[in-house]
Amino acid sequence: VSIQQLERFRSLSPAEFFYRNKEIAGFSNPARALYQSIRELVENALDATDSYGILPVIKVSIDSGIIPDKPEVYLISVEDNGIGIPPDNIPQAFAQLLYSSKYVLRQTRGMFGIGVKMAVLYSQITTGKPVEVLSSTINSSRIYMFRLSIDIKNNRPVIHHKASFKKSSEWHGTIVKLFIEGDWNRAKSRIYEYFKRTAMIAPYATIVFKDPSNNVIYFKRSTTLMPKPPREVKPHPHGID
């Protein structure tokens, strides 16, 4: 075998791998991508609230016609009243794959630090626009805003803009806004069903959803009783070498 025929080897960053294989995370077409983005953002919002003993209030909207001549591009906005994210962690939390607060032995809805970043990555691939994140922690006097994208080759966040504002209320939580190429007509039945089922399994949550036709669905919490927040635990002795 000549030297010219030898195979060449190279490594891929996690971001580059999922960029090439986005269907693995459920982003195989515009309809599934719209549904999966909503699901990832809402489940992050629930984890930021009920995992810390906060009764969730989650507001979701999907808007169309934001970009002229591109009716297939939608703006997704999800707001929660959770614990918020410290500003130093916001870029990595939304724009670095395999970076997460969930790499602990504690039950949460996500495990791998991939979901919301895949929504950001798909948004970046299909629209070229950064994600916008606003967040404030419970005891903070300020709201922090970032516009971010992912450096796919190096799996690092790219900060396009950042700012902070003095809070005029006691609000705490996170707001995420991202543009995405989607197919509302094909995805809407799954999205409506997802909200109905989420309201059933989390009856302590208030969820407000506005669709692209400006129809508003309001799921009012039916109880204030919540399951105890999960605790981080030590590994089981059987799994220790």
Show which residues each predicted segment covers.
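Bergerat-fold GHKL ATPase/HATPase_c domain
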Residues: 1-55, 88-92, 226-231, 238
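Mobile ATP-lid/nucleotide-binding loop of the nucleotide-binding subdomain
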Residues: 93-97
